[in-house]
Amino acid sequence: MGVFVFLPLVLPLTAWPVARLAEQRLHPRTATRLLTAVAGVLAVCSTLCLGLLVIVGTAQLPGNPLPDGWSDPEVRAAVPYDEVAGRAAIPALLAVLLSCAWGAWRHARVRRRAVAALAGLPAGPVAVLPDPDPYAYALPGRHDRVVVSAGMLAGLKAAERRALFAHERAHLTGRHHRHLLVVHLAARANPFLRPLRTAVTYTAERWADEDAAIAVGSRRTVARAIGKAALMSRAPLSVTLPAFAAAGPVPRRVAALMRPAPAGRAWPSAFTAAGLAVWGAAAGATVSALSSANSAVTLFAILRAATPV
């Protein structure tokens, strides 16, 4: 197992360049999917390796419930600096699990409150809340709905309203809430993945912007709607529920919409900075997966041999 058990804990650093460059050089749809996949793989691998270290660390504690053979020198020799690393991993894994559980619970609570706020309103794909505060967001579920306040609608013209609805429907169609939830939990599992969470928050909004521009047939109208909504909007309901103007740097989104639409299937050459960043992130995720698999299989074999029959 050796040092391979530590690699997945730091390999998320290999994804930092792609988090910076993908949002600028790739189509938002491609960037969102790529970054979400990389973040998910790296988070799972780093958490798995923490768990392996916890097993070794727990076996050294007096009175632990694990088999006595698991504290043998052969087991401890599988992990460099086993005494320090094993015991440090115990509070680290506990913090990861608590943080992810807290994030998932908050997401579920926001979803429940959002659904409860629609009680008594007519069923349909669009729900208009009689609230003077301007906001709009996509609420996924068994029956996907676009939720918008009366205050938001009052501040937009007819064409801008169409852009708003197209944007939110794009969030629902693309299941962007799943991407946001994955990167949000991944960043809680490993703080080195926070740049990917920030990048996906932006690229998911850009993805919806581009789909909305196609739906309404005017990039300028969508840009104008985003700008006006941003000036009116309050804080987002939740970081894992896509909102029209709250997520992502609005000036950058508007500037992107004022340029020609990005190529849908464009992929950077491996000899460009963006291409190297993509391949670097892919290599990091692959090495992380192989390292965690190698560590898990090796430790399993060692523990099996050390377990009395």
Map each language-model feature to its residues:
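Membrane-interface helix-boundary signature
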Residues: 2, 28-32, 79-85, 267, ...
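Polar-ligand-bearing catalytic/cofactor-coordination segments
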Residues: 14, 18-31, 85, 89, ...
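C-terminal region of N-terminal signal peptides and the immediate post-cleavage residues
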Residues: 49-62, 102-109, 283-307
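Hydrophobic transmembrane alpha-helical segments in integral membrane proteins
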Residues: 1-11
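Pan-zinc metallopeptidase signature
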Residues: 252-309
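Juxtamembrane extracytosolic/periplasmic "stalk" immediately C-terminal to the first targeting helix
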Residues: 30, 63-70, 115-120, 298-305
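Transmembrane alpha-helical segments that serve as helix-helix packing and pore/cofactor-lining elements
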Residues: 16-81
